[in-house]
C-alpha cells in the first residue's frame, strides 16, 4: 500500500532488529528515513536514507535534531524511552499521531500508571506503593505488614530490566536498593506478587475503540522477568477479552488516546485478568512476526507507522482474525561465553517458518539473560502441539556456548 502524499521526512528513534520492520514500513510509504541512536553498528541504520549519531533518550538533543533535519514526523522505536521522546518532539512541533507528552508519561511510567488507574477506577491492576526516596522505601520495607512475596520494579525500565521478587523483609530491602540503582528517574514501585499465568494482549485503537486484537501466553525460562517464548493465542482469552477491551477503551477515552497500538501484560488468576503494565509501541522479540500470522497477514508495524506518522488509518481491514497457532522463541544463551551455534531437532525444525539471527558464531556473550542471539518463528496445527514443543520440549533446542578460559 503506497502513500499518495508528498514524501515525508521521518526521524526513526533507533534502528535495532526490533525496529527494522518499522523502517521497512516507512520505506513502503515512500518516506525519507533518518535514523538515530548511539549504536552506529545496529543493522537498521544501513537501511535508512541517513543516520545521525545521537542519544534518542535525550529529549532536547532529539528535538534539536528534528528541527535541524526539518522532519515531518517522528516514529517511536521499540523502547519506552523512544515513545516518550517522540511524544515530546511531536508536541513541541505540532505533529499529529502521538499522544501528548503528559499522557505518554502516564502510560509509560509504572508509578504514574498505577496512580491513574486508581483515580479512574474500574481498572483491575495490583495496588502498588511507589517511592522516589530510597531511605523512605527501606523504612517502609522494614515495617510493612504486607504479605510476601512482593515484586519490586523501577518505574521507567522495560523488558524485565530491574524487576525482582522478594520473599522476605531482608530480600525486599536488597531488591529496593537494586531497583533504585537501575532506575534513571530514581523511582520504584512495590506490588504484591500474583500467582497465575502471564499473558500479552495487543490491540490497535481507532477513534479510541479496539479495532484489532492479538493475544499470547508469555513464558520465561532462563530469566524469570524477561519473556523468552510467546505462544499465540492466549489460553482462556475468551474469559477475559471482553473485559480487557472494556478497560482499554475506558482508558483510551479518559486519556484521549490517539490511534495505534495499545498493548498490556496481564496475569490470569481464577478467571480474572490483572493488568501489570501498558505500553503504546511495537513489542520486542519481533513479536509482530507471529502476530501477523495469527492475524491473517495483518501488518502491525505498517499500521503503527501510519498512525504515528500522520498518514491516517484509511483502508484499515474490516476485521482481524485470531487464527491458527503461532509462536516465537528468543534464543537466550544458558550462560556467558562464546556462541558456537544452535542445534534444532528435525521434528521441531519443520515447524520453523522464519528466523532472524542477531549474532553470529564467535560472538562473546557477556549478559546472557538479557542478550538474545536470535529468534525462531514457528507455526503449529494444534494448540497442544505448540505447547508441547515450545514449553515442555524447551530444552531440546540447544544453544552451544563455549565458556571463556
Which role does the model predict for each range below?
Residues 34-37, 146-147, 311-315, 350-364:
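Short amphipathic beta-strand starts and helix->beta connectors
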Residues 331-361:
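Glycine-rich active-site loop/lid that clamps phosphate-bearing ligands
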Residues 167-168, 203, 331-334, 376-382:
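Short beta-strand-to-loop capping motifs
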Residues 243-264, 269, 279-336:
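Active-site "cap" helix and flanking loop/linker of ATP-utilizing ligase/carboxylase catalytic domains
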Residues 163-273, 282:
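Internal nucleotide-binding/catalytic subdomain
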Residues 91-162:
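A conserved helix-loop-beta module that forms one wall/lid of the active-site cleft
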Residues 1-103, 135, 323, 333, ...:
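ATP-binding N-terminal substructure of ATP-dependent carboxylate-amine bond-forming enzymes
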Amino acid at each position: 500500500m503506497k502513500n499518495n502524499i508528498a514524501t515525508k521526512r521521518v526521524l526513526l528513534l533507533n534502528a535495532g532488529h526490533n525496529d527494522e520492520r518499522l523502517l521497512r514500513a516507512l520505506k513502503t510509504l515512500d518516506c525519507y528515513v533518518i535514523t538515530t541512536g548511539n549504536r552506529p553498528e545496529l543493522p537498521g541504520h544501513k537501511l535508512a536514507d541517513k543516520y545521525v549519531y545521537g542519544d534518542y533518550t535525550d529529549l532536547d538533543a532529539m528535538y534539536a535534531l528534528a528541527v535541524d533535519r526539518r522532519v515531518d514526523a517522528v516514529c517511536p522505536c521499540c523502547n519506552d524511552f523512544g515513545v516518550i521522546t517522540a511524544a515530546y518532539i511531536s508536541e513541541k512541533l505540532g505533529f499529529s499521531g502521538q499522544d501528548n507528552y503528559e499522557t505518554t508519561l502516564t502510560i509509560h511510567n509504572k508509578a504514574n500508571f498505577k496512580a491513574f488507574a486508581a483515580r479512574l477506577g474500574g481498572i483491575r491492576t495490583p495496588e502498588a506503593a511507589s517511592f522516589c526516596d530510597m531511605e523512605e522505601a527501606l523504612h517502609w520495607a522494614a515495617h510493612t505488614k504486607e504479605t510476601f512475596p512482593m515484586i519490586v520494579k523501577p518505574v521507567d525500565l522495560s523488558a524485565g530490566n530491574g524487576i525482582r521478587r522478594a520473599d522476605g523483609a531482608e530480600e525486599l530491602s536488597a531488591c529496593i536498593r537494586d531497583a533504585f540503582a537501575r532506575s534513571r528517574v530514581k523511582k520504584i514501585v512495590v506490588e504484591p506478587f500474583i500467582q497465575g499465568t502471564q499473558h500479552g494482549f495487543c490491540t490497535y485503537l481507532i477513534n479510541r475503540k479496539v479495532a484489532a486484537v492479538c493475544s499470547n501466553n508469555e513464558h520465561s525460562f532462563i530469566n524469570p522477568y524477561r519473556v523468552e517464548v510467546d505462544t499465540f493465542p492466549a489460553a482462556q482469552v475468551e474469559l477475559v477479552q471482553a473485559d480487557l477491551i472494556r478497560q482499554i477503551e475506558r482508558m483510551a477515552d479518559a486519556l484521549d488516546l490517539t490511534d495505534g497500538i495499545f498493548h498490556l501484560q496481564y496475569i490470569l488468576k481464577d478467571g480474572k485478568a490483572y493488568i501489570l503494565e501498558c505500553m503504546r509501541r511495537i513489542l520486542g522479540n519481533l513479536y509482530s512476526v507471529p502476530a501477523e500470522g495469527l492475524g491473517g497477514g495483518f501488518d502491525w508495524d505498517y499500521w503503527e507507522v501510519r498512525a504515528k506518522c500522520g498518514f491516517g488509518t484509511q483502508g484499515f481491514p474490516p476485521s482481524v482474525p485470531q487464527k491458527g497457532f503461532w509462536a516465537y522463541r528468543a534464543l537466550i544463551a544458558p550462560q556467558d561465553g562464546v556462541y558456537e551455534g544452535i542445534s534444532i531437532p528435525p521434528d521441531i525444525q519443520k515447524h520453523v517458518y522464519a528466523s532472524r539471527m542477531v549474532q553470529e558464531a564467535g560472538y562473546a556473550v557477556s549478559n546472557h539473560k538479557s542478550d538474545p542471539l536470535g529468534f525462531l518463528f514457528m507455526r503449529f496445527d494444534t494448540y497442544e502441539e505448540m505447547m508441547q514443543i515450545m514449553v515442555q520440549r524447551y530444552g531440546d533446542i540447544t544453544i552451544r556456548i563455549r565458556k571463556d578460559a
